[in-house]
Amino acid sequence: MIPFLGTALGSACVFFMKKSLGDLVQRALAGFAAGVMVAASIWSLLIPAIEQSEGMGKLSFLPAFIGFWVGVLFLLLLDHLIPHLHVGSNQSEGPKSRLGRTTMMVLAVTLHNIPEGMAVGVMYAGFLAGNAQITAASALVLSLGIAIQNFPEGAIISMPLRAEGESKGRAFLGGVLSGVVEPIGAVLTLLAAQLVIPALPYFLSFAAGAMLYVVVEELIPEMSQGKHSNIGTVFFAVGFSVMMTLDVALG
């Protein structure tokens, strides 16, 4: 629930900010979120997945490799099956649909949030299973890191919805609904991973692959478009540093 709280608080910005997010601010927020997700994918998911497969010797990378690619392909499949519209775009993706712009914008961020919920779920599954390499602190750090990047993410969806003409209440609700999938995904992944604990490295790297797909497909283009695109790069580095520090110092 901690990451979902971050989304809700970010979405609440619509009640306190009168104007829509400027392009510069939106690129900074997208860059920060991307940095957090990349660092979380490396330190919280991929490295533990490889470490837990050390018994395989030179093939210890294999579970992480397989899980990573399955995660990428899973998000690619969802991208093609679910109609959605990225913030700031006029061209919808996925199958043709009569859904409104608001609904498709919410669906785009919902797709983004699926791997984040899965990442939290698989970390807690490892902790509850007694995995020595996944502690309560490391699971909590990942939850906090995703909550931190969910705050700007909530604002990124609620503020454009407001700019589209939605009321503040409906814009807030749209932002909140986009994050509901996270606790649901976390619980489902936690239950699935606990049923097949030996496959935990695959689950960890699956979540990493899905998260990095979102970063490359959505956040990097969003943080790099238009003039002053270097602001997105700077905030990417800030987000990466924050998540890396949290994971190494506290995890």
Give the residues covered by each predicted segment.
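Intrinsically disordered, metal-sensing/regulatory segments
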Residues: M1-G251
